[in-house]
């Protein structure tokens, strides 16, 4: 039985159902980007927005990740990573160390807090490959990510801190789901009428 629409549990449920999704056939081509009108662009934010729509959860537009984080801050529903108590359904924002981009550049949905300074996050446009691009990897993956400097355990190794903070959507009352209209089939090109052959004129008779 599906979790209640508009709830954190439903948001997580919807997101986890997409695990294993791979972009294509073109680079950054996804149903998530088609939904937000940002197809063929990095799509981690579009994935989150698509999931929120399916779960009927109200949250700021986070297709552009820095703007999404700023909106949560402005709404007073933002927690800095080191001070946070993340919960399932929270929106995790990332700034990966040493990736050449010194700002928030990735986003995902918290599945659970591991209790060791790390969380499990379901993310779009990432990869399980250690050497792969974590913020443009082309897949939907469940990842273990650190949000506190002191993290890990005897069983699980520590990880570099990538999460800078969490935003909490307005769970509770479901918002109306936006339906995605299928693109109309392309109309066949009109056939050109064959060119008319000019009528032959007979040479004037000699008198």
Role assignments for model-derived ranges:
Residues 1-57, 170-181, 205-207:
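N-terminal capping segments
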Residues 11, 51, 58, 65-67, ...:
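Generic signature of intrinsically disordered, low-complexity, basic-rich segments
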């Amino acid at each position: 039985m599906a979790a209640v629409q508009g709830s954190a549990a439903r948001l997580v449920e919807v997101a986890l159902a997409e695990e294993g999704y791979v972009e294509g056939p073109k680079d950054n081509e996804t149903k998530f980007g088609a939904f937000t009108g940002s197809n063929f662009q990095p799509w981690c934010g579009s994935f989150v927005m698509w999931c929120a729509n399916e779960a009927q959860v109200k949250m700021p537009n986070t297709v552009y990740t820095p703007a999404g984080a700023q909106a949560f801050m402005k709404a007073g529903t933002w927690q800095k990573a080191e001070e946070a108590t993340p919960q399932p359904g929270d929106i995790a924002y990332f700034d990966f160390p040493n990736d050449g981009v010194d700002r928030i550049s990735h986003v995902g949905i918290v599945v659970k807090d591991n209790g060791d300074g790390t969380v499990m996050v379901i993310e779009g446009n990432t990869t399980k490959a250690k050497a792969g691009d974590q913020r443009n990897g082309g897949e939907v993956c469940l990842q273990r990510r650190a949000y506190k400097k002191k993290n890990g355990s005897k069983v699980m190794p520590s990880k570099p801190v990538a999460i800078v903070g969490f935003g909490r959507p307005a769970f509770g009352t479901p918002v109306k789901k936006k339906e995605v209209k299928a693109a109309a089939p392309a109309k066949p090109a009109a056939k050109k009428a064959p060119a008319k052959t000019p009528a032959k004129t007979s040479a004037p008779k000699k008198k």
